[in-house]
């Protein structure tokens, strides 16, 4: 049983150097690890030999005649002192070695593009007809189907707050700060309908619905994400050993912490719903208007625990699931393969699914689908026992089902009418029908009510 990054470091260090270079990281980290690993292996051998010698001497002392026992006891004390020093040095070296090992990102799949400066992803496929103004046509990806319109539609922020009057970020800013919001009336029902649509669809695909804990202890949160990079992006509960999750993925991954599984127990498929809490510390002034990029949003998430040999099949499958959900809504989208330098540390490969925003004349990220291979399971100690008692780390994968809050913004832009009404995608109507107060076909502008 071996962690793939550790195995590559020991057997193919040049491969890891290439990965770090492709990710635009310092490749000298490999040499730092190999030096510590060599020291650790030398000390491990020394400790094992000293223990063997000490045990042998102890047995010899028990059988020795009285006149030799003092001599053997003196040797045993000397050996015990040497063993204690060696064990302490081994422990310190192991801790330093593990710290460096944990700082390595995942290896990358051969299909991950290595991109030049200024390019973060490569389009893979497109679906749907994008509505665009003439000035944007030349900027579209090659082969995209488009329909030229006279003027760009109203942006999602103004649609929600000015036209429909069903969101209020100004008041939320007063009471909570920027990137918070109040959502009202039909947009609330739309959020719930989107969640039910995604949960229902994925449950029918065999995914087990779950609402995970919204907080995790430090020892778990550091195992499920690249904590050193993202510690400033997630919320910590003051005075508590707890962090708010940034996605349901975190809580679901932790569910099988330290579990030993049998082959027949895999795959395990989960579809989680949760609020997601993010500081958006690096966002600056980007997307400051509306509810596109906020501190709290709702999301349905796919998560898979897989046999190692099946994970790439599952990566394509969960990406396809999300495409089908977005296609069902009728939103034009593209799938892009994320370049090596833009991959998060856990991912061996990641697709983003980006939906067309006609007011901006561009595609924007709506979902991400990653194969994390054994990067997460190594840290969480989740293994599978194979036939012949061979043990391996399972592979984990995650993929957005629907980020419902952001999906609302895409619906507001793509399905608005001249009179300010917004057509509700047909697939959502069955989830709205049982609710008497909910809209059924259209979301109509409504006069704002005074607080």
Swiss-Prot record:
GO terms for molecular function: ATP binding; serine-tRNA ligase activity; tRNA binding. Keywords: Aminoacyl-tRNA synthetase, ATP-binding, Cytoplasm, Ligase, Nucleotide-binding, Protein biosynthesis. It is found in: Cytoplasm. It comes from the Archaea. InterPro entries: aa-tRNA-synt_IIb, aa-tRNA-synth_II, aa-tRNA-synth_II/BPL/LPL, Ser-tRNA-ligase_type_1, Ser-tRNA-synth_1_N, SerRS_1_N_sf, SerRS_core, tRNA-bd_arm. The keyword Protein biosynthesis applies. Pathway: Aminoacyl-tRNA biosynthesis; selenocysteinyl-tRNA(Sec) biosynthesis; L-seryl-tRNA(Sec) from L-serine and tRNA(Sec): step 1/1. The keyword Protease does not apply. It catalyses: tRNA(Ser) + L-serine + ATP = L-seryl-tRNA(Ser) + AMP + diphosphate + H(+); tRNA(Sec) + L-serine + ATP = L-seryl-tRNA(Sec) + AMP + diphosphate + H(+). GO terms for biological process: selenocysteine biosynthetic process; seryl-tRNA aminoacylation. L-serine binds at residues 247-249, 301, 400. Its EC number is 6.1.1.11. One of its GO terms (cellular component) is cytosol. ATP binds at residues 278-280, 294, 365-368. CDD domains: SerRS_core (cd00770). Homodimer. The tRNA molecule binds across the dimer. Catalyzes the attachment of serine to tRNA(Ser). Is also able to aminoacylate tRNA(Sec) with serine, to form the misacylated tRNA L-seryl-tRNA(Sec), which will be further converted into selenocysteinyl-tRNA(Sec). Consists of two distinct domains, a catalytic core and a N-terminal extension that is involved in tRNA binding. Belongs to the class-II aminoacyl-tRNA synthetase family. Type-1 seryl-tRNA synthetase subfamily. PANTHER family: SERYL-TRNA SYNTHETASE (PTHR11778). This is Serine--tRNA ligase. It comes from Pyrobaculum aerophilum (strain ATCC 51768 / DSM 7523 / JCM 9630 / CIP 104966 / NBRC 100827 / IM2). The lineage of its organism: Archaea, Thermoproteota, Thermoprotei, Thermoproteales, Thermoproteaceae.
